[in-house]
Amino acid sequence: MNWNFQNTYTELPDVYYSDTKPYDFENPRLILFNSDLANKLNLNVNSNEKEICDFLLGKKNKEKKFFSQAYAGHQFGNFTILGDGRALLLGEHVYKNNRFDIQLKGSGQTPYSRNGDGKAALGPMIREYLVSEAMHHLHVSSTRALAVISTGEKIIREKFEPGAILVRVAKSHIRVGTFQFGSLLKNKNYFNNLIDYTISRLHPEI
């Protein structure tokens, strides 16, 4: 398996992201793997389970720059700066002139985690995997799920639950909240940088 990674998002001012390292889980195990999506991304899956897990968790790309994105929005009725509190971007996989964000959800703490552990439970990650694939096959644009990986940990929620990571794929993780965050910066150049980048990446025909 090989990524064809680029990181054009980090060409934006660094207020829009923070460098993040994934937690090094000792006993990851592949629970679900979307071979159809992997083939569409030209990942050439001919590896054993451990190699697939190491590959998907970024262990084969330790020299690369991983990061979490900043954004803002409403939470519990209040407008606040949020950011990826339990997700990071491994990079942008490029295939046939198409660019896909590869994101790990539940990979550990980030600079935006606040008091959270940055991790995720297995049940919700399986549920998101199933729902995102259902949305895709119903022709509703959304993220897609490449894999669910058990971390081998027990994490504390209402009770102890098995931990997991969801590997998500999307054309971009830029969202409304990214622009809400940009507007808070009171820096016209930074905001225009974001607008120009988004148009160039997602709507070059404009």
Predicted regions and their residues:
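Broad phosphate/nucleotide-binding scaffolds in NTP-utilizing and phosphate-metabolizing enzymes
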Residues: 1-126, 130-175
